[in-house]
């Protein structure tokens, strides 16, 4: 028999039609309860690992700092532990019936490189239930999570609770919400290297506008998106009022070249480069209550926020465009100097909370 093109085409059409009929018939089971065939499981994991490995090629890994850990740990407790469990609490039995089931990360993290972990955290994994980071343009937060995951396998329950600010309380009211916020934002948890802002000393206007901006996604943060996703606007306002009423402890003034450079920029700006003076708007008597108070904030937090403004990723309340323009000409050394200055600036120099 001579095989002609029409025979080949006929076989292909028959195969396609057969595949369609099998799929349409519903004979292929999609039950999670029965699991995958072993070969299916092997192929799916092979494809996933190969894809992540290739996508991670050329990814530049930033330096990790201790300041990354508390923010990422708090997010892990709020958004990840419900599936993966944690050193403080085992994962719920219900998620064990997912297909594939979320793994215990203590044993899995060591099998991935930093770049590969970033790809998984930032983009998620299809067909596994592993979501992408809640917002697409906050790679800095995803890298903080990678820094935390690197530390995760060595944490015991007490170390995990200390890092996350984990608090288990019975109340379901405002006390619970305040305790949850303080798990990250409590003043005694903040250090110069913290990426978490100090809330005490801010105006209720600024805090309310910031929280509503997070809720409306005009200020984008995967960490805050998860933290406030279940809160009503009334609860956001109550939280803003509460934290605005907390006093801010004075901070000692520090000397040094970086501090002095930051002080000059804050007081005078740099007119030759179009950089305005920060203190013409911030931290002065009768300042616009929508402007945040900068004195006493962790240096790492301030530097990160300024970088986000420079990169046009920051967002925020009604005056976000003002700050985007003000920060546009800042260079890396300017950001470091301003962060050092305002972090060390005496809070007593600024106006009392509204």
Model region roles, listed by residue range:
Residues 2-86, 92-95, 108-123, 128-183, ...:
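Periplasmic c-type cytochrome electron-transfer domains
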Residues 93, 99, 203-225, 254, ...:
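Extended intrinsically disordered, low-complexity coil regions enriched in Ser, Thr, Gly, Ala
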Residues 236, 276-285, 290-354:
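C-terminal functional regions that serve as terminal interaction/effector modules
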Residues 92-98, 193-198, 290-296:
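Short cysteine/histidine-rich zinc-coordinating motifs and their immediately flanking basic loops
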Residues 162-165, 258-259, 305:
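N-terminal targeting leaders
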Residues 86-87, 187-188, 284:
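Cys/His-rich metal-chelating microdomains
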Residues 178-183, 256-283, 287, 291:
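Short, solvent-exposed interaction modules
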Residues 89, 190-191, 287-288:
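Short, non-ligating residues that shape and space the ligands of small metal-coordination modules
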């Amino acid at each position: 028999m001579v095989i002609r093109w029409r025979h080949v085409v006929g076989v292909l059409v028959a195969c396609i039609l057969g595949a369609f009929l099998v799929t349409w018939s519903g004979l292929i089971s999609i039950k999670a309860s029965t699991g995958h065939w072993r070969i299916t499981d092997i192929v799916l994991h092979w494809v996933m690992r190969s894809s992540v490995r290739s996508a991670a090629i050329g990814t530049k890994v930033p330096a990790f700092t201790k300041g990354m850990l508390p923010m990422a740990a708090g997010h892990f407790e709020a958004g990840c532990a419900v599936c993966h469990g944690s050193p403080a609490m085992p994962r719920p039995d219900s998620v064990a019936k997912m297909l594939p089931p979320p793994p215990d990360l203590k044993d899995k993290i060591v099998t991935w490189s930093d770049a590969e972990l970033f790809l998984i955290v930032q983009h998620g994994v299809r067909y596994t239930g592993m979501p992408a980071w809640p917002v697409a343009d906050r790679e800095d937060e995803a890298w903080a999570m990678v820094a935390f995951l690197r530390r995760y396998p060595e944490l015991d329950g007490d170390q995990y609770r200390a890092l996350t600010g984990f608090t288990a309380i019975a109340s379901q009211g405002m006390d619970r919400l305040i305790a949850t916020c303080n798990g990250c934002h409590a003043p005694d948890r903040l250090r110069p290297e913290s990426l978490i802002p100090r809330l005490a000393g801010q105006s209720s206007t600024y805090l309310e506008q910031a929280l509503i901006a997070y809720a409306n996604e005009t200020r984008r943060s995967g960490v805050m998106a998860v933290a406030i996703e279940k809160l009503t606007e009334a609860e956001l306002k109550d939280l803003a009022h509460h934290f605005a009423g907390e006093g801010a402890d004075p901070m000692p003034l520090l000397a040094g070249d970086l501090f002095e450079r930051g002080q000059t920029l804050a007081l005078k700006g740099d007119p030759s480069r179009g950089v305005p003076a920060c203190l013409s708007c911030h931290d002065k008597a009768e300042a616009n209550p929508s402007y945040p108070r900068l004195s006493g904030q962790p240096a790492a937090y301030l530097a990160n926020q300024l970088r986000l403004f420079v990169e046009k990723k920051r967002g925020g309340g009604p005056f976000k465009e003002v700050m985007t323009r003000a920060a546009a000409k800042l260079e890396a050394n300017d950001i470091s100097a301003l962060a050092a200055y305002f972090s060390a600036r005496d809070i007593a120099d600024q106006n009392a909370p509204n």
